[in-house]
Design a protein with these regions (language model features):
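Condensing-enzyme catalytic core of the thiolase-fold
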Residues: 1-230
Length: 230
């Protein structure tokens, strides 16, 4: 509690919501001391922490690594602990990497998510200078005349396990991550210009790896920024 007032607000919120996710999953600090898989060495607490973040605006500490590391320290976890920045895809990339480690048996469980706060005006100065912000205060994704987006704030954290482990342990299962894919747009007409074909390739790869028929997809959440470039 003495440190809470001075640490990075993103660090504080991610820790708070990580704790809430752990409680919702039915775990305590003690029950998270999960032993390594059979035949593997290592200390108990084989739970990874993966935090996605876009901007580091709180310069008193100057360390985004602490967003994930503080959770691992507080819960006495010995799995991978990393904070990563891939801009708008940061939280999804964190979940992708968490799932990869689970599938490869490197961890027994994972705490993954993202946090994004706007706590300094320099962020808006940069976005405005790059013509990312909407001129009328509204985001018109997929609409005619859109010229930018309005940044939001938020934090979200989930607890992930292999399906077989979750079923064996009687966990409440909210949903399944069947597959995920990660790539880059490469060289385009400009550094901030998206590559539609690369995005389509990532979607197709995830569908193929997950064995999902695209015709059976019932809900899509898109990254529709509403900028002039899409």
């Amino acid at each position: 509690p003495r440190e809470a007032a001075s640490i990075d607000p993103q660090e504080r919120l991610f820790l708070q919501h990580a704790w809430m996710a752990v409680e919702d999953a039915g775990y305590t600090r003690a029950s998270l001391q999960i032993a390594p898989a059979s035949g593997q060495s290592g200390q108990p607490g084989q739970v990874g922490v993966y935090a996605g973040v876009m901007y580091g605006e709180y310069n008193l500490s100057g360390s985004l690594a602490s967003i994930a590391n503080r959770v691992s320290w507080f819960l006495n976890l010995h799995g991978p602990s990393l904070t990563l920045d891939t801009m708008c895809s940061s939280s999804l990339t964190a979940i992708h990497l968490a799932c990869q480690d689970l599938r490869l048996g490197r961890t027994r469980a994972a705490i993954a998510g993202g946090v994004n706060l706007s706590i300094h005006p320099n962020k808006y100065r940069m976005l405005s200078g790059g013509q990312f912000l909407s001129s009328d205060g509204h985001c018109q994704s997929f609409g005619e005349g859109g010229d930018g987006y309005i940044p939001g704030e938020g934090v979200g954290v989930v607890v992930l396990k292999r399906l077989s482990d979750a079923q064996r342990d009687g966990n409440h299962i909210y949903g399944l991550v069947r597959a995920s894919a990660l790539n880059h747009g490469g060289k385009t007409n400009g550094y901030t210009v998206p590559n539609p074909q690369a995005q389509a390739d990532a979607i197709a790869r995830a569908l193929a790896e997950g064995g999902v028929d695209p015709r059976r997809v019932g809900y899509i959440e898109a990254h529709g920024t509403g900028t002039k470039l899409g």
